[in-house]
Amino acid sequence: MKVHVYTGGKRIVERSGVGRAIEHQKDILRAEGVTVDGVRFKDADIVHINTVLPDSALAAMRARIMGKKVVYYGHSTMQDFRNSFKGSNVLAPLFWRWITFCYNLGDVVITPSEYSKFLIESYGVKVPVYAVSNGIDLGFWKADKEGRRAFREKYKLTDEEKVVISVG
């Protein structure tokens, strides 16, 4: 199976959570033996799309015309869009219509939580929506005795003092 992970607009999202999600998707697909590296759009069996930018919607339409399956990732909701910048609340109803249109271009939508699944389904998206956590890179977040020692030394913490760390 060959998968093309569409990266149009990557410069806009590469430093965001969406950019990291794209890299995680590629890593997981590779680990499962799926060919993702160097797969051209026209040669793919499946196209994965991560943004609701206009070029992504066009890519989804092109894929469907070519008979390819489309996996659309539901990273965006109207609720997240609201209050994100001055005037966003005025644009939110248009954004809702746009993302509903985009998500309906997929054969399935994958979103990171049950809450976002509920929201996306409530918009009237007609294709199946699945909640699948983005997960974390366990290789990066593994126990490291030297790192632990350096952290405690830097913050002047004894081995007996408890430390609570939050990520997310």
What residue ranges belong to the model's regions?
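Short N-terminal targeting/anchoring amphipathic segment
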Residues: V36-D55, K69-Y73
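Active-site proximal beta-strand in glycosyltransferases
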Residues: I46-H48, R62-F81, V108-I110, Y130-A131
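N-terminal subdomain of nucleotide-sugar transferases
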Residues: M1-F41
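Carbohydrate-associated surface elements
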Residues: Y115, G135
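A short helix/loop element that forms part of the nucleotide-sugar donor recognition site in Leloir-type
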Residues: K142-L157
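Membrane-proximal helix-turn-helix segments that form the acceptor-binding/catalytic region
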Residues: I65, V90-V109
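Acceptor-binding helix/loop patch of EC 2.4 sugar-transfer enzymes
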Residues: G8, K68, Y72-R97, G139
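Conserved donor-binding/catalytic core segment of Leloir-type glycosyltransferases
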Residues: T158-G168
